[in-house]
Design a protein with these regions (language model features):
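Ligand-binding clefts/hinges and TM-proximal coupling segments of bilobed small-molecule sensing domains
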Residues: 42-48, 171-187, 228, 257-289
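Periplasmic-binding protein-like
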Residues: 63, 138-145, 216, 220-257, ...
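Bilobed "Venus flytrap"/periplasmic-binding protein-like clamshell domains
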Residues: 63-66, 76-89, 121, 142-197, ...
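Extended ligand-binding regions for polar small-molecule ligands
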Residues: 82-90, 147-149, 163, 170, ...
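Acidic, polar ligand-binding/catalytic clefts
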Residues: 94-158
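Short helix-initiation/N-cap motifs at beta->coil->alpha
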Residues: 97-107, 151, 187-202, 236
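A ligand-binding cleft/hinge motif common to bilobed small-molecule-binding domains
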Residues: 103-104, 120-128, 177-178, 201-234
């Protein structure tokens, strides 16, 4: 989860039946890179948007985090990108997705450079002091294993007596190592997600441990090689960030509700294999910690 002001870029590579399927992720895209989609208002009651936004919304994201937002063939893609486009359609305005370094997005919203932050922001009480959040998704940490495994893992205590593969430098590595101080856990740390997946596929590790939506995406692209096990834990809401007093919070919340009601929300999450993080009741500033 992106709980700090530093983006945690990942290379997500999935091992499949003797070959590797790479999920494209370009980490060296300039902050000025953007993709623009012109939308028209969907049918139904119009959502009022301040006149100053009639020309469109600049939506900032750090496109280094598949499956949420990443660059593929020169365009920003991912479920966050798709949701942003869907919101533009409901609001009837042009949406420009702007690739920006993660820790510049909230300051950019505050100084008017960006209208919306859409970059897997965990909604926290600390962040709510400076921006408003429209919560639309939940994410945490999750496990995945070989599809033919008969074991079920729920929560950190389930790691006891098992080998778990993690990516070096992640929250999951820290959590697994903390659990290893309480019981016997063989923590296998690797430099990238590809090596983590290989450790699970060849049986060195009983399970892989990653952010819940990343784990879901790995399974989604594994061609039946992996499956999720247990339920996500340490979950927290993701939110679209807007400046306080911008007049965007209420219309964006209404737009999120409309996208959900239309079924488009479910279609987008299903497309990216992250339906496990779906919520049914979007809220304004719903942080719990």
């Amino acid at each position: 989860m992106r709980t700090t002001m530093t983006a945690r870029a990942r290379r997500v590579l999935v091992a499949t039946a003797g070959s590797l399927l790479a999920i494209a992720m370009v980490g060296a895209v300039t902050a000025s890179a953007s993709t623009t989609t012109t939308t028209t208002r969907s049918s139904g009651s119009p959502i009022k948007l301040a006149t100053k936004y009639a020309s469109g919304l600049r939506m900032a994201m750090d496109a280094t985090y598949p499956p949420d937002e990443f660059v593929q063939n020169g365009h920003i893609v991912g479920f966050d990108a798709d949701l942003g486009m869907a919101l533009g359609k409901v609001l009837g305005v042009k949406v420009t997705l702007v690739d920006a370094t993660f820790d510049t997005i909230i300051p950019g919203i505050q100084d008017g450079k960006f209208d919306v932050g859409n970059s897997s922001f965990t909604d926290t009480k600390a962040r709510e002091k400076v921006v408003d959040f429209i919560d639309y998704f939940k994410a945490g940490e999750g496990f995945y294993e070989q599809a033919n495994s008969t074991k079920t893992f729920n929560g950190l205590k389930a790691l006891c007596g098992h080998s778990v593969a993690v990516e070096t430098g992640t929250t999951e590595q820290a959590d697994a190592q903390s659990q290893a101080k309480l019981c016997k856990v063989n923590v296998l740390s690797y430099a990238d997600q590809n090596q983590v997946n290989l450790a699970v596929s060849d049986g060195r590790a009983d399970l892989g441990f990653a952010d819940s939506q990343v784990a879901a995406y790995i399974v989604h692209l594994s061609d039946g090689q992996f499956k999720l096990t247990g339920t996500p834990f340490e979950t927290a809401p993701y939110g679209f960030a807007v400046a306080k007093g911008s007049g965007l919070a209420a219309p964006l919340l209404a737009a999120v509700k409309a996208v959900m009601a239309s079924g488009q929300y479910k279609k987008i999450l299903d497309k990216w294999g992250v339906e496990q993080g779906a919520i049914s009741d979007p809220t304004l500033n719903g942080a719990t910690s």
